[in-house]
């Protein structure tokens, strides 16, 4: 469940003073308008500033989405969707000053047998050290498990899926995110769990990775598979029907196998998991056509859809969509006779986004 904040009083007293006289003016990010509201959208990974001069902004709406985790490769679990924090309070306000904005990167795509990485934090707040309760913050998504790692490799706002060749095929459990209680009554829940993997001998011989957790749903387990990613959470900016997307979808779990099956010296064919809506990347399948399972589709209904996984000896998990916080897709393995292959990777996590909207002064 994504965070819902009520009774929020947004008055950051620690922003650097910027009043110089004249009309109220805010700068930073890409500045657009919709109806009677002004919107600042920050999409570039890294640090930026939001500066407000000559007064305060009432009825502020803020959305912060962190980077998604990357998917594992070689029996890979999928990356979890990035965390999301939003603030929508008619009585909230931002005081004049300069504030720091950070857009978190998605987890890095890694090769077969190399541990996937967690997504980075995103935040908005004063220019000092970012922390609760002075900042609005969202934690990056957890990374997916790979061969020999237990569960998802790094915990995050939403859990990464477990590996399909793990001694502990249970999913990560999503931690609770702290809430900015200094600003008023708040309700916060960070997200969802990654799906469990299905290791050798239990399917039999599936070795499927679990789906990544999304902001609005758990990642699917590998058994019964395919391991789909959890759904992201839908959030509308400034009442704009064209700015109403899902964010933080989990990636789809990877699959391993060969079309010949165990009787012919290969591995049973199974399909990789589709990603959750909200920009997750689809799972990759190392199975060879014809007769094998297929790759998983990327998650749509997002600012930028997640990419599909790919299939075959050079398979990879799909990347999470740009500025969605979608988790990367897990990948199966390169050709089962010779691994790891030079191009087999889990999907990268999608970068996050920060959006600020308010009534046009």
Regions found by a protein language model. Name each.
Residues 2-361:
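Low-complexity, glycine/proline-biased repetitive segments and flexible coils/loops
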């Amino acid at each position: 469940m994504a965070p819902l904040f009520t009774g929020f009083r947004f008055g950051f007293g620690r922003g650097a003073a910027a009043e110089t006289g004249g009309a109220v003016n805010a700068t930073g990010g890409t500045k657009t308008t919709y109806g009677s509201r002004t919107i600042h959208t920050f999409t570039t990974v890294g640090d930026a500033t939001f500066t407000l001069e000559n007064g305060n902004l009432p009825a502020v709406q803020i959305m912060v989405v962190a980077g998604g985790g990357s998917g594992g490769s070689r029996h890979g679990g999928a990356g979890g969707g990035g965390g999301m924090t939003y603030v929508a309070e008619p009585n909230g306000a931002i005081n004049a000053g300069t504030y720091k904005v950070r857009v978190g990167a998605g987890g890095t795509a890694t090769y077969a047998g190399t541990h996937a990485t967690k997504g980075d934090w995103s935040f908005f707040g004063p220019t000092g050290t970012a922390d609760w309760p002075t900042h609005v913050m969202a934690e990056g998504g957890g990374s997916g498990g790979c061969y020999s790692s237990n569960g998802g490799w790094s915990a995050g706002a939403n859990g990464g899926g477990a590996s399909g060749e793990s001694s502990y095929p249970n999913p990560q459990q999503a931690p609770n995110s702290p809430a900015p209680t200094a600003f008023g009554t708040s309700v916060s829940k960070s997200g969802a769990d990654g799906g469990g993997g299905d290791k050798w001998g239990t399917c039999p011989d599936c070795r499927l990775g679990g789906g990544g957790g999304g902001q609005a749903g758990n990642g699917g387990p590998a058994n019964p598979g395919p391991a789909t990613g959890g759904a992201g959470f839908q959030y509308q900016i400034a009442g704009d029907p064209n700015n109403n997307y899902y964010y933080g979808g989990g990636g789809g779990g990877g699959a391993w196998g060969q079309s010949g099956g165990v009787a012919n010296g290969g591995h049973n064919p199974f399909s990789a998991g589709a990603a959750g809506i909200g920009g997750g990347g689809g799972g990759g399948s190392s199975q060879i056509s014809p007769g094998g399972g297929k790759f998983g589709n990327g998650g749509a209904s997002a600012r930028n859809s997640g990419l599909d996984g790919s299939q075959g000896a050079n398979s990879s998990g799909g990347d999470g969509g740009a500025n969605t916080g979608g988790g990367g897709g897990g990948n199966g393995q390169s050709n089962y006779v010779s691994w790891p292959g030079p191009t087999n990777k889990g999907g990268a996590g999608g970068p996050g986004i920060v959006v600020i909207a308010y009534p046009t002064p």
